[in-house]
UniProtKB/Swiss-Prot annotation:
This is Signal recognition particle subunit SRP54. Its EC number is 3.6.5.4. One of its GO terms (biological process) is granulocyte differentiation. It comes from Danio rerio (Zebrafish). Component of a signal recognition particle (SRP) complex that consists of a 7SL RNA molecule of 300 nucleotides and six protein subunits: srp72, srp68, srp54, srp19, srp14 and srp9. GO terms for cellular component: cytosol; endoplasmic reticulum; nuclear speck; signal recognition particle, endoplasmic reticulum targeting. Component of the signal recognition particle (SRP) complex, a ribonucleoprotein complex that mediates the cotranslational targeting of secretory and membrane proteins to the endoplasmic reticulum (ER). As part of the SRP complex, associates with the SRP receptor (SR) component srpra to target secretory proteins to the endoplasmic reticulum membrane. Binds to the signal sequence of presecretory proteins when they emerge from the ribosomes. Displays basal GTPase activity, and stimulates reciprocal GTPase activation of the SR subunit SRPRA. The gene is srp54.
């Protein structure tokens, strides 16, 4: 049972409260039984599950609860709070300092995905604007340097290693010295792993640690071993000063929940989780947003961060066009490019309230990305006049031979080009409405700048554009309005970043 299954089962248990006519002790116990069964199936320690049940029962006294209170809401809140506590070690994680050398040393057993995770972390910080690099001090595993070199080259990250030097301490020290002199901000050192916790592994880790004096030692943990993670993490913490943990392979193993709760029990903060084999299948781990996404409640904060990463406010030309209600096919193409930059599509969908981690299966995700690429391929066959026309759809309707030319050039049927133009027309209509709303692009809190009735009209326009199935998963019109309110308050001025995204 992967994490998506765990989320679905807990959500189903909580939903049973909504179906119950009267909320009494029997209904509460039945719901808790389902939640606990799901957690045990995910390999969460039985003592932790028992504690969660007792804490919820202690927090909810149905007999003493005032009649005016929403019992369902109170119970759901109590369960949510206890699930957060289950994966929260209660320890603040180390964070790097911008503008100075931050040395991060990776440790872990062989096969945990340590080398790949080094590259993922370097790439993550590189995308955030940090100067990052990689050092391969793994001289034990054949091909370790080749793997790191390949990953680093693909992501355009500077790296250091040696095919001739066999002493990992020398390689690590030389690499750190080199990159410090070049003012790199994130210096990641990959060390040797073993098949088991050998004394020689710990001795080597200590030597490398003493040589490079890391600011943070990260232990990489394989989620597939479940609650056995606790013993492993403690063994490493006893030998070296492990400050953070990254849990890998959470995308396809039944024991992910057990692994996360076990690590939290060691009081080691989990800083990231690996959710796939690709370099951007990597997410910062924050307890509340994680549980929120798991239960299909979304992560607006994470979505805002993704949109802010695109630095859309810097694109003054686009903002000026949006203010005047103008939107060309080239603008739509650029918005599709922005969606591609935001990371794995399933990861983004999971941040929207109403979409659990199981809504977007790998097959659906690939299908959506393929569709997006197909639309971009069609636009690649258009000329400048077509892409930059203020009403591109009208130009094509007046001269249908253009549709045939674009279809031939992109290798698609004419109906595919027509579908793209229909999509574009919907976007252009919404932008026209946005351009007529005063205060939308003013900056600051949009909820204060924008007339509520105008905002409601815009929400209705967006609802018309959306697939009915998508709108249903968001909780209908009320769910869409709630999400937009959160987005307005948290990402003032960045609403145009949602362009194109809402209809995918």
């Amino acid at each position: 049972m992967v994490l998506a299954d765990l989320g679905r089962k807990i959500t189903s248990a909580l939903r049973s409260l909504s179906n119950a006519t009267i909320i009494n002790e029997e209904v509460l116990n039945a719901m808790l039984k389902e939640v606990c069964a799901a957690l045990l199936e995910a390999d969460v320690n039985i003592k932790l599950v028992k504690q969660l049940r007792e804490n919820v029962k202690a927090a909810i006294d149905l007999e003493e609860m005032a009649s005016g209170l929403n019992k369902r809401r109170m119970i759901q809140h109590a369960v949510f709070k206890e699930l957060v506590k289950l994966v929260d070690p209660g320890v603040k994680a180390w964070t790097p300092t911008k503008g100075k050398n931050n040395v991060i040393m990776f440790v872990g057993l062989q096969g945990s995905g340590k080398t790949t995770t080094c590259s993922k972390l370097a790439y993550y910080f590189q995308r955030k604007g940090w100067k990052t690099c990689l050092i391969c001090a793994d001289t034990f595993r054949a091909g370790a340097f080749d793997q790191l070199k390949q990953n680093a080259t693909k992501a355009r990250i500077p790296f250091y290693g040696s095919y001739t030097e066999m002493d990992p301490v020398i390689i690590a020290a030389e690499g750190v010295e080199k990159f410090k002199s070049e003012n790199f901000e994130i210096i990641i050192v990959d060390t040797s792993g073993r098949h088991k916790q050998e004394d020689s592994l710990f001795e080597e880790m200590l030597q490398v640690s003493n040589a490079v004096q890391p600011d943070n030692i990260v232990y990489v943990m394989d989620a597939s071993i479940g609650q056995a993670c606790e013993a492993q993490a403690k063994a490493f913490k006893d030998k070296v000063d492990v400050a953070s943990v990254i849990v890998t392979k959470l995308d396809g193993h039944a024991k992910g929940g057990g692994a996360l709760s076990a690590v939290a029990a060691t009081k080691s903060p989990i800083i990231f989780i690996g959710t796939g084999e690709h370099i951007d299948d990597f997410e910062p781990f924050k307890t509340q947003p994680f549980i929120s996404k798991l239960l299909g409640m979304g992560d607006i904060e994470g979505l805002i961060d993704k949109v802010n990463e695109l630095k859309l406010d810097d694109n003054e030309e686009l903002i000026d066009k949006l203010k005047h209600g103008q939107f060309t096919l080239r603008d739509m193409y650029e918005q599709f490019q922005n969606i591609m930059k935001m990371g794995p599509f399933g990861q983004i969908m999971g941040m929207i309230p109403g979409f659990g981690t199981d809504f977007m299966s790998k097959g659906n995700e690939q299908e959506s990305m393929a569709r997006l690429k197909k639309l971009m391929t069609i636009m690649d066959s258009m000329n400048d006049q077509e892409l930059d026309n203020k009403d591109g759809a009208k130009l094509f309707s007046k001269q249908p031979n253009r549709i045939q030319r674009v279809a031939r050039g992109s290798g698609v049927a004419t109906r595919d080009v027509q579908e793209l133009l229909t999509q574009y027309t919907k976007f252009a209509q919404m932008v026209k409405k946005m351009g007529g709303i005063k205060g939308l692009f003013k900056g600051g809190d949009m909820s204060k700048n924008v007339n509520p009735s105008q905002m409601a009209k815009l929400n209705q326009q967006m609802a018309k554009m959306m697939d009915p199935r998508v709108l249903h998963h968001m909780g209908g019109m009320a769910g869409l309005q709630s999400m937009m309110r959160q987005f307005q308050q948290g990402a003032a001025g960045n609403m145009k970043g949602m362009m194109g995204f809402n209809n995918m």
